[in-house]
């Protein structure tokens, strides 16, 4: 597998609408304010998190069960700054909508700005022909409240090209998270 360059990413956006909206260069300042960067980088794309968050809470004394997930585990917030409680977790989503080509696997890594503050972002790989908004999982590993800034960079996506086309893509097997919009909760 080879990692794809900024040149390839631009071409895939133009020819296959791979990322919408697409920002062709790194943005580090907005209205004269420093922000957490987003946009195209040398070998990846730094995506933004929207202002839509679901924050884990224990006010309803429920159990987190991935096979029978309860929305009572979460508090919905539409905010410019999401505050994640200590040692807790929040879900967000990318502003960008992705359409992954059939010969590409996309891996997500966190931003060092957040990682150095004890905030970890996790996303499972975006499989060939998957499309949708990416649900982002943010973990606050610190004993203090932590901030996530909406409309700023949250993670970086790396595009890996296979030397061979897959037999069955995510679309072929009708994956349960296909064409998701908004923050998508666990499905079984």
UniProtKB/Swiss-Prot annotation:
GO terms for molecular function: dCTP deaminase activity; nucleotide binding. DCTP binds at residues 111-116, 135-137, 156, 170, 179-180. The keyword Cell cycle does not apply. The active site is at 137 (proton donor/acceptor). Its EC number is 3.5.4.13. CDD domains: trimeric_dUTPase. The keyword Hydrolase applies. Signal peptide: none annotated. One of its GO terms (biological process) is dUTP biosynthetic process. Pathway: Pyrimidine metabolism; dUMP biosynthesis; dUMP from dCTP (dUTP route): step 1/2. Coiled coil: none annotated. Homotrimer. This is dCTP deaminase. It comes from Rickettsia canadensis (strain McKiel).
